[in-house]
A protein has these predicted regions:
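Short, solvent-exposed loop/linker segments at the N-terminal edge
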Residues: 51-58, 144-150
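Surface-exposed, short loops/turns at beta-strand junctions within beta-sandwich domains
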Residues: 6-13, 99-106
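Flexible, low-complexity linkers/stalks enriched in Thr/Pro that connect modular domains
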Residues: 22, 31-42, 125-134
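A structural signal for beta-strand boundary/capping segments at domain termini and interdomain linkers
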Residues: 27-30, 120-122
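Extracellular acidic loop/turn motifs
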Residues: 67-76, 159-160
């Protein structure tokens, strides 16, 4: 048998109660079934690292928080570049963290939070590791020689 509610049901838990009786007035014990409606993916916020971070360090810790009011628990995976997504432990408060080792150049960190209903939220961060020191190409002083107490200009050309 099917039932269509007269109006859309809100996200959350719902219970359907069933009563049955026959023409002779014999009533069955009431039965019920509970279910959840979940149309909203979990929230996901990343507190560290910031997007487009440029650093000279290869060690970084991804930290964040997730929550889903309807379909707990929420699972979190973190993927670095083209590696495998790894499950991360999520605390009772929704907080999580994972240490990563970045490579020189551009790194893509993908964090996915997925609730028990299969809804997911994805946040991506790009972190650039720059370990190349700048190069001083030239230094000029004008005028040269410099007179004491006079104004002079020092020009420096640097590449990075």
């Amino acid at each position: 048998c099917t039932y269509t509610p007269g109006s859309a049901l809100a996200d959350g838990s719902h219970t359907v109660k069933i009563d049955a009786s026959d023409f002779d007035g014999n009533a069955a014990a009431q039965k019920s079934v509970s279910f959840k409606i979940d149309t909203v993916p979990p929230t996901l916020s990343i507190s560290s690292p910031s997007d487009r971070l440029i650093t000279n360090k290869t060690a970084i810790t991804v930290t964040g928080k997730t929550n889903d009011a309807t379909s707990s628990p929420v699972t979190v995976t973190i993927k670095l570049n083209s590696g495998n997504a790894e499950a991360v432990e999520v605390g009772a408060d929704g907080a999580f963290s994972k240490a990563l080792t970045l490579v020189a150049g551009s790194n893509t960190i993908t964090v996915v939070a997925k609730d028990a209903a299969g809804k997911s939220t994805t946040v991506t961060r790009t972190v650039i590791v720059d370990q190349t020191a700048p190069v001083i190409k030239s230094i000029t002083i004008n005028p040269n020689p410099v007179d004491a107490g006079k104004t002079y200009v020092i020009c420096v050309e640097v590449t990075d």
